[in-house]
C-alpha cells in the first residue's frame, strides 16, 4: 500500500507494530471480510485488519475454518484492501493462510503466500503453528513476505483438539507453547496471535518475546487484542464466548429495520413521492 499524504496518519507497518510494543502502546486489530466493513474499520482507527479464515464461519456458515481456499481468501482480501485504500490507508491488512495452503511443504507455503501477496496489496500473511511450520515461516520471510504467527487454540487443528477449550492449561503444554513462540520469532515472524490461553501465560510470553503478541481470549497482558467483528458487533447471536465483549447489538437493530421495511412495503408507504422519480 502507498503511504497516505497530507494530515492522514501513517500506514501501520511491521516496524510500527514493533515500535508500539517498545513504547507500551496497545495494538487494536479486528477482522473484516468485505469492502464496506474495511472502510468503516480503517476510518475508525484500528491498527490492523485481519482477513480471517473465520470468514468460513461468519460469512459462509461452515462449522469450522477448514473449508476456506486460497482463492476464497484472496477474494475477501481484495475487497478489504480496496476498502482500506478508499479511506485513510492506515490499517495494516493481514491475510490468513487457509488450511493446507502451507502445511504440506515449505515450497508449497512460499508458493501460496506469494500468490496471496501478489494478487492484492496486503501487508502480511498469518499462519497457525509452532515448530512444525518454522521452516515455512523462515522461507516466506526470507523472500520478503511478513508473517504473523498464531499459537494456543488453533482453529485449523480443531479435529486434533476435539474442542475449542482453553489451551496450555497444563504445565507441559504451556512449556511447549513458550518454546514454539520463541521458535516462530526466531524464524522471522513480526507478531504472534495468542488464542484462548491463560492470561498469566500470555503475559509471560509477551515479556519473553521482542515481537508483539495479539491476544484473543488471552487476557490483558498481550501487546494487543483482536476480535471477530461479527462477534463484537453482536451479529453472531448464537456464539458468545467469555472473551468477547459486545459493543453493539446489531442483530436486533438490523432485524427491526428489516421488519419496518417489510411493513412499509406491504402497506404501500414505501416508496413515497419524495423517494420516486
Swiss-Prot record:
Q: Which cysteines are joined by disulfide bonds?
A: none
Active site annotated at which positions?
Answer: 195 (proton acceptor)
Write the record's keywords in alphabetical order, separated by commas. Answer: Cytoplasm, Magnesium, Metal-binding, Pantothenate biosynthesis, Transferase
Q: Which InterPro entries match?
A: Pantoate_hydroxy_MeTrfase, Pyrv/PenolPyrv_kinase-like_dom, Pyrv_kinase-like_dom_sf
Give the top-level enzyme category.
transferase
Which free-text remark accompanies the cofactor? Binds 1 Mg(2+) ion per subunit.
- In what pathway does it function? Cofactor biosynthesis; (R)-pantothenate biosynthesis; (R)-pantoate from 3-methyl-2-oxobutanoate: step 1/2
Pfam families in alphabetical order: Pantoate_transf (PF02548)
**Positions in coiled-coil regions:** none
Per the record, what is one GO cellular component? cytoplasm
Its cofactor is:
Mg(2+)
Primary localization class, coarse: cytoplasm
Q: What is its EC number?
A: 2.1.2.11
- Subcellular location(s) per record: Cytoplasm
Q: Which GO terms describe its molecular function?
A: 3-methyl-2-oxobutanoate hydroxymethyltransferase activity; magnesium ion binding
Q: Which domain of life is it from?
A: Bacteria
Q: Which reaction does it catalyse?
A: 3-methyl-2-oxobutanoate + (6R)-5,10-methylene-5,6,7,8-tetrahydrofolate + H2O = 2-dehydropantoate + (6S)-5,6,7,8-tetrahydrofolate
**Residues where Mg(2+) binds:** 53, 96, 128
Cite the binding residues for 3-methyl-2-oxobutanoate: 53-54, 96, 126
Q: Which GO terms describe its biological process?
A: pantothenate biosynthetic process
Q: Which NCBIfam families match?
A: panB (TIGR00222), PRK00311.1 (NF001452)
* Homology family: Belongs to the PanB family.
Q: What does this protein do?
A: Catalyzes the reversible reaction in which hydroxymethyl group from 5,10-methylenetetrahydrofolate is transferred onto alpha-ketoisovalerate to form ketopantoate.
Subunit-level organization: Homodecamer; pentamer of dimers.
What name does UniProt use for this protein? 3-methyl-2-oxobutanoate hydroxymethyltransferase
Amino acid at each position: 500500500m502507498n503511504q497516505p499524504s497530507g494530515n492522514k496518519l501513517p500506514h501501520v507497518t511491521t516496524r510500527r507494530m514493533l515500535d508500539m510494543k517498545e513504547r507500551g502502546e496497545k495494538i487494536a486489530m479486528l477482522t473484516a471480510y468485505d469492502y464496506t466493513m474495511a472502510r468503516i474499520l480503517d476510518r475508525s482507527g484500528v491498527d490492523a485488519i485481519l482477513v480471517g479464515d473465520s470468514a468460513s464461519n461468519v460469512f459462509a456458515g461452515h462449522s469450522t475454518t477448514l473449508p476456506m481456499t486460497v482463492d476464497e481468501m484472496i477474494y475477501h482480501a481484495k475487497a478489504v484492501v480496496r476498502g482500506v485504500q478508499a479511506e485513510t490507508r492506515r490499517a495494516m491488512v493481514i491475510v490468513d493462510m487457509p488450511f493446507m495452503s502451507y502445511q504440506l511443504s515449505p515450497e508449497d507455503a512460499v508458493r501460496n503466500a506469494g500468490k496471496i501477496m501478489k494478487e492484492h496489496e496486503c501487508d502480511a500473511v498469518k499462519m497457525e503453528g509452532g515448530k512444525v511450520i518454522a521452516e515455512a515461516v523462515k522461507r516466506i520471510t526470507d523472500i520478503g513476505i511478513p508473517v504473523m504467527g498464531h499459537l494456543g487454540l488453533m482453529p485449523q487443528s480443531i479435529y486434533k483438539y476435539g474442542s475449542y477449550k482453553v489451551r496450555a492449561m497444563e504445565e507441559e503444554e504451556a512449556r511447549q507453547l513458550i518454546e514454539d513462540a520463541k521458535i516462530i520469532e526466531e524464524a522471522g515472524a513480526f507478531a504472534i496471535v495468542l488464542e484462548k490461553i491463560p492470561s498469566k501465560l500470555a503475559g509471560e510470553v509477551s515479556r519473553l518475546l521482542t515481537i508483539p503478541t495479539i491476544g484473543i481470549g488471552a487476557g490483558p497482558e498481550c501487546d494487543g487484542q483482536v476480535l471477530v467483528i461479527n462477534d463484537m458487533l453482536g451479529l453472531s447471536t448464537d456464539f458468545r464466548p467469555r472473551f468477547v465483549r459486545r459493543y453493539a447489538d446489531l442483530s436486533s437493530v438490523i432485524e427491526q429495520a428489516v421488519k419496518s421495511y417489510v411493513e412499509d412495503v406491504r402497506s404501500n408507504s414505501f416508496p413515497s413521492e419524495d423517494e420516486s422519480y
